[in-house]
Design a protein with these regions (language model features):
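N-terminal, positively charged/glycine-rich alpha-helical extensions of SAM-dependent methyltransferases
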Residues: 1-10
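Conserved alpha-helix/loop element of class I SAM-dependent methyltransferases that forms part
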Residues: 18-40
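Class I SAM-dependent methyltransferase SAM/SAH-binding core
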Residues: 40-97
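A short acidic, Gly/Pro-enriched loop at the edge of an enzyme's catalytic core
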Residues: 96-107
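A short SAM/SAH-binding and catalytic strip from SAM-dependent methyltransferases
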Residues: 105-120, 142
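A short glycine-rich, Lys/Arg-flanked "PGG" loop and its adjoining helix->strand segment in the class I
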Residues: 120-135
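Conserved class I S-adenosyl-L-methionine
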Residues: 135-161
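Short alpha-helix
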Residues: 172-189
Length: 192
C-alpha cells in the first residue's frame, strides 16, 4: 500500500476527488445507515481511513472495536489527533504485512485499492480477515474517467501542477483498474 505523508490530505482529497463527500454520504447515510440496525458488528477493520470515514463508522457502530491500519506514521498520528475512539487500535503497518485476526464484520477500504502493489492478494487478505458474512465497503479510482477527473478537479481548485502530474503519471502513481477488473478480483478472492 502506498504511503501518504501529506497532513493536508483530508483537504486536498476533496479537491482531487470530485464527489468525495457525496461518496461518503452514499456509503454512510444511504447504505450503512439502513443496514446498521440489522448488523451485529463487534469489530471493524479500517484501511488507510480518513477522519470522516472513521467518524462515520464510529457513529453507526459505537460499541464496535475498530482496527485502523495505516502505513504512514504521519497520517496515523494525524488521525489519532483528530478522531477520539477509545476502543480503536491503530497499527502503523502496510495492510499486506499486518497480522490480524479473521474476525471483522466490516472492512472499510475507500480509495485505497488503486495504490496497492497487488490488488488481487490485497482483496484476498481482506476476505480472509472478515468473519463469515462480513461486509466489505470498497471504493476505488477508475482510470476510465481520468479526463473527466482532470477537468473537474481543476475546476474545484485542486493544485494545477499536482493534477497535471497525476494525470500524466497515472500509471506510475496508481494501478489502472476498471470496474470489471475489480469485480473479477473480488469474485476470485471469494466475495459474492
Amino acid at each position: 500500500m502506498k504511503e501518504f505523508k501529506n497532513k493536508d490530505y483530508a483537504t486536498e482529497i476533496r479537491q482531487k476527488i470530485p464527489g468525495y463527500d457525496v461518496m461518503l454520504d452514499v456509503i454512510f447515510r444511504g447504505v450503512l445507515l439502513r443496514l446498521a440496525p440489522g448488523l451485529k458488528v463487534d469489530k471493524v477493520l479500517a484501511l488507510a481511513s480518513q477522519t470522516d470515514e472513521l467518524n462515520g463508522l464510529a457513529s453507526l457502530f459505537p460499541k464496535a472495536g475498530v482496527t485502523v491500519v495505516e502505513p504512514s506514521e504521519a497520517m496515523l498520528q494525524e488521525l489519532k489527533s483528530q478522531v477520539h475512539l477509545p476502543q480503536a487500535e491503530y497499527l502503523n503497518s502496510r495492510f499486506e504485512e499486518a497480522v490480524l485476526p479473521s474476525a471483522y464484520q466490516i472492512c472499510s477500504c475507500l480509495l485505497v485499492l488503486q495504490f496497492v502493489e497487488n490488488p488481487s492478494l490485497f482483496l484476498r487478505k481482506i476476505y480472509d480477515s472478515l468473519s463469515e458474512g462480513g461486509l466489505l465497503i470498497l471504493s476505488f479510482f477508475s482510470n476510465q474517467q481520468l479526463g473527466y477527473w482532470k477537468t473537474l478537479a481543476s475546476e474545484l481548485g485542486a493544485n494545477q501542477q499536482q493534477v497535471q502530474r497525476t494525470y500524466e503519471n497515472q500509471a506510475g502513481l496508481m494501478n489502472s483498474l476498471s470496474p470489471q477488473e475489480v469485480a473479477d478480483m473480488l469474485e476470485e478472492a471469494g466475495f459474492t
